[in-house]
């Protein structure tokens, strides 16, 4: 009969503690948290939102089984100069965004900070254009200011 993997007995606590401490590092979420990898490689640098300038409008093809072109914009962040792709929500709201507009982006809310649904490689969405909520412009409640 093979032996046990874990030590057991009255004085095994220290050994168990050391083992747990060592094998915790095999857990990817623990490792990411301890080494600060999310903040290190995050374009928003850990912030909930970021300001950026629209470089161009792009269409991203949806993943199977859907057939659609999701309207997105390429945004250069003001804080660090990184360029990210951001999804433009709401029907026809891409018409309210022009190149060189200032937009506020936030995370799209996918699993584990990744992309959401059928939009591949897009982790952010536009929430404001030139300081006004995209939703308010789309609803006709406010007008988009010209810069």
From Swiss-Prot:
GO biological process, one term: translation
Pfam families: Ribosom_S12_S23 (PF00164)
MF (Gene Ontology): rRNA binding; structural constituent of ribosome
The UniProt record lists the keyword Ribosomal protein: yes
Bilayer-spanning residue ranges: none
Keyword terms of this UniProt record: Ribonucleoprotein, Ribosomal protein, RNA-binding, rRNA-binding
Gene Ontology cellular-component annotations: small ribosomal subunit
Described purpose of this protein according to its UniProt entry: With S4 and S5 plays an important role in translational accuracy. Located at the interface of the 30S and 50S subunits.
Family per record: Belongs to the universal ribosomal protein uS12 family.
Subunit organization: Part of the 30S ribosomal subunit.
Name this protein carries in UniProt: Small ribosomal subunit protein uS12
